[in-house]
Regions:
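Rossmann-fold NAD(P)-binding glycine/threonine-rich loop
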Residues: 2-10, 17-40
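Short acidic/polar active-site loop segments enriched in Thr and Asp
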Residues: 10-11, 63
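Short strand-turn motif at the edge of the Rossmann-like AdoMet-binding core
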Residues: 15-20, 45-47
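Active-site-lining helix/loop region of Rossmann-like oxidoreductase modules
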Residues: 39-182
Length: 182
């Protein structure tokens, strides 16, 4: 298993925030490889954050997790979800509903944060995913809800640029050298 994942053999590995591999087998393989070699794989939170609370809730019980993404119609251009009518619509329109795994197979570079969040919570097959086209919208708005009886977390992150994804890598790198980790 480790031969195909050489990056984990030479130290800790920090994948880019665009983790977009919904395959549970791949996830298990790299996890086992890191374990065999005494390494850790650090997944930056990218554009969303909140992996700690998602993981905590999922550890407490069978979490119900949903992921809602709002995007401008221009950002959907060139994808299977794009329809020309989205450019002239005056109201928000749902263009996808399914699992995070299904969403990433259709839009691997547009909703990659959903896979990272689903790995931290209920799993790609179990996260309920919806994508909406919003007229005139610039950027992305991601709303993640995870809940079990007695506990509910809602994360709502809007960003007009992808700069937050790069800074999430900086945050992970700082944690690697800091005596206090957030």
């Amino acid at each position: 298993a480790c031969a195909s994942h050489k990056g984990t053999n030479h130290g800790s590995y920090l994948p880019a925030p665009q983790i977009s591999h919904p395959d549970e087998t791949f996830y298990r393989e790299i996890s086992e490889c890191a374990k065999e070699n005494g390494r850790k794989i650090h997944i930056a939170s990218g554009a969303i954050g909140g992996f700690d609370v998602l993981r905590t809730i999922s550890l407490m019980g069978q979490a119900q997790t949903s992921f809602r993404t709002k995007k401008g119609p221009k950002s959907l251009s060139g994808t299977p979800l794009f329809e020309e009518s989205l450019m002239t619509d005056r109201e928000e329109k749902q263009v996808f509903h399914g699992s995070a795994k299904e969403a990433i197979s259709i839009l691997p570079t547009k909703v990659n944060v959903a896979i990272a969040a689903s790995l931290a919570s209920s799993g790609p097959e179990n996260v309920d995913m919806s994508i909406f086209s919003v007229p005139e919208m610039v950027g992305d708005d991601h709303k993640i809800t995870a809940q079990i009886p007695g506990v509910k977390a809602e994360l709502d992150i809007y960003s007009s640029t992808s700069a937050i994804a790069g800074w999430s890598v900086v945050a992970v790198l700082r944690n690697l050298v800091s005596p206090i980790v957030f």
